[in-house]
Amino acid sequence: MSGLYSFELAGLDGKLIRGDCATGKDRQVLFITGFLSKRWGNKSKALAQWCEEQGWGFCCYDVRGFGESEGRFTDYTLSDWLADARAVLDLLKHGPPFTIVGNSLGSWIAWFMAQEFDVVDRLVLIAPAFNMMGVRAKQITFSVKMKVVVILHSLTTIVHSSTSVQRT
């Protein structure tokens, strides 16, 4: 991906959150990984390539305690990973509007971020972990529901092949 740059942000405990971004125009896409997934898995690679073809920005990161970010995995909780997502969005919020693509646990985090950041105007949730939210899932406001596209089990709008990314 051209124009890719790496970033480091200090988490609330001073440990570094590491990620990568590519600039683009009109829209930015933030990919939030699922539980125990590193930022450059197959989904994020395919999505990054597709964003580049659209001329959109793309960003992905590793939560503290996993991947290339600092810290021990066992020292962090969901609250910490929500804070990591806030830090990344704070870094990027002054650019074009955001679509957050969340995978599994990342969908749960994305849902919270969409409520906190006005720059997030679209969500794509892959196998969202809403069962973790209990009663909160029932309290999703209509305006947030209008942002959400739920995709169960697979990302059907982007198919990664060895030669290209195609829309289906």
Which residues does each predicted region cover?
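Short beta-strand immediately N-terminal to the catalytic nucleophile in serine-hydrolase-like folds
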Residues: I100-G102, I126
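N-terminal cap/lid segment of alpha/beta-hydrolase-fold proteins
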Residues: M1-G24
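Short substrate-entry loop that stabilizes the transition state in hydrolases
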Residues: L36-N42
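Short beta-strand element of the alpha/beta-hydrolase
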Residues: D26-G34
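Catalytic nucleophile-loop/oxyanion-hole region of alpha/beta-hydrolase
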Residues: G67-L92
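Conserved alpha/beta-hydrolase
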Residues: S44-E70
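The alpha/beta-hydrolase serine catalytic core
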Residues: W108, D118-T168
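Gly/Ala-rich beta-loop-alpha elbow adjacent to hydrolase catalytic centers
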Residues: G102-A110
